[in-house]
C-alpha cells in the first residue's frame, strides 16, 4: 500500500513539475479566446492587454497603448454578430517566465450587409508579460490573414 502511495505522489509531483510559464501563457491565451467568444473581441482585448500594448493588425497603423486601443475600438466597434476565435499552438517563455509568446491560428466570422457569410482565417503571435499577481497579460499582438475574405 505504501508503495502505491509513493508512486502516486511521484506521479503527481511530476505532473505538477510539467506546468510552467509556457503552459500558463497557453492557458491565458485560451481564456482570452473564450472571453472573445463570450463578450466580444474588443472587450477581451481590453481585458487582457497591458497599458503599454502594441497592436499590429489590419490595414491601419500600429496601435500603441491601451488608451489608443480604447479610442480605436470606440470608433470601430466589433461588427454586429461577429466572432473572433483563435487557438494557440505553441508557446515560448523566458527562463524566468516573466515574458514570452504564444502563436496560433485565428478565425473571424461575420455577415456582410446582405447577410452573406464572411470568413477570414490567419495566424497570430501574442507577446505575454507576467504581472505582479503572477497572471499574464499581453503587450504585443501581431495578426495577419492568410487569404482574402470570402
Regions found by a protein language model. Give the residues of each.
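Bacterial N-terminal signal peptides that target proteins for export
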Residues: 1-7
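Short, structured motif recognition centered on aromatic/hydrophobic residues
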Residues: 32, 86, 99-103, 127-128, ...
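Generic short beta-strand segments
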Residues: 52, 103-110, 144
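Short, low-complexity N-terminal intrinsically disordered segments enriched in polar/charged residues
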Residues: 2, 12-51, 149-150
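Short beta-strand edge/turn micro-motifs at domain boundaries
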Residues: 121-146
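Long compositionally biased, domain-poor regions of proteins
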Residues: 27, 34, 47, 73, ...
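A solvent-exposed, acidic/Ser-Thr-rich amphipathic alpha-helical stretch
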Residues: 22-26, 40-92, 103, 116-119
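A short, structured loop/turn motif at beta-sheet edges
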Residues: 91-100, 113, 129-135
Amino acid at each position: 500500500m505504501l508503495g502505491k502511495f509513493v508512486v502516486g505522489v511521484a506521479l503527481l509531483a511530476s505532473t505538477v513539475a510539467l506546468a510552467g510559464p509556457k503552459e500558463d501563457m497557453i492557458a491565458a491565451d485560451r481564456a482570452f479566446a473564450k472571453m472573445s467568444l463570450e463578450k466580444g473581441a474588443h472587450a477581451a482585448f481590453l481585458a487582457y492587454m497591458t497599458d503599454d500594448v502594441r497592436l499590429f493588425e489590419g490595414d491601419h497603423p500600429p496601435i500603441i497603448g491601451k488608451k489608443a486601443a480604447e479610442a480605436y475600438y470606440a470608433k470601430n466597434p466589433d461588427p454586429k454578430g461577429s466572432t473572433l476565435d483563435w487557438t494557440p499552438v505553441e508557446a515560448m517563455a523566458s527562463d524566468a517566465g516573466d515574458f514570452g509568446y504564444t502563436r496560433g491560428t485565428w478565425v473571424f466570422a461575420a455577415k456582410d450587409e446582405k447577410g452573406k457569410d464572411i470568413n477570414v482565417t490567419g495566424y497570430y503571435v501574442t507577446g505575454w508579460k507576467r504581472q505582479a499577481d503572477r497572471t499574464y497579460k499581453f503587450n504585443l499582438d501581431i495578426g495577419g490573414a492568410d487569404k482574402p475574405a470570402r
